[in-house]
Amino acid sequence: WILSSHSHSAPILCPIDLYDGFSPYFAGLKDRIICLITNLMSQLQPVTIHFGQSNCDFNVNRRLVDTNGNCRMAPNIDGVVDKSVPVISCRDINNSLVGILFSYCCHPTILLGPKISGDYPGWAQNSLEKKHEPVVALFLPGVFGNVRPYFGSGDRFRPGTESDVISCGYELANAVEEGLKDSYHVPTEVIQAWRIKPQLPLDKPLSMEELGKIASQSIASQSENDSTNSWKNGFNIARR
């Protein structure tokens, strides 16, 4: 499996939406990753694992329901959102930092193309790696189904800019730094992993009329917040 921290300004890796095949970029990326892993297997070293956590505040729930029950794409300050920033770090036998894995619950959708970008996670990674060179910093996408970046106090989302990417990236990197400061050693014998598949009860299915209304609201609210041309540009460059 290859886990990618997605953005709306990077090449498409797998079949999605209107693009129905794996991109040439994916094939080359897969080969490079396999080569990288093979080389790293010969450079394994003992490390200690540490865990810390802090918070970051630029994410917001993106579904606002009005008094009539209509839902639209808009900042919902009181909506459900997770602002925590969990941080796992690795240190070598000299207690020197060698790796950082951090997570945050927010869609990396500040930029929409046509420029290729790692969005705020990429900027946060670069910031951390420059400060702690030669550390490798990795981003793990959090549970951000209806959460996106928010830059102001208005009742609509405005298009993001490169300055917003830098600002949010630095803010997240600073939160990771706080998590590193407050981290504690985790004995390897207590580390566990498990997988569960909870069965959730289903409500009565919506009618086609109700689904059509929801779809119309979604399209209308999306048009209010994002540039159609930006989406088309990002889609076209991703196909290449």
Each predicted region: which residue ranges?
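Non-catalytic substrate/cofactor recognition surfaces at enzyme active-site rims
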Residues: 1-240
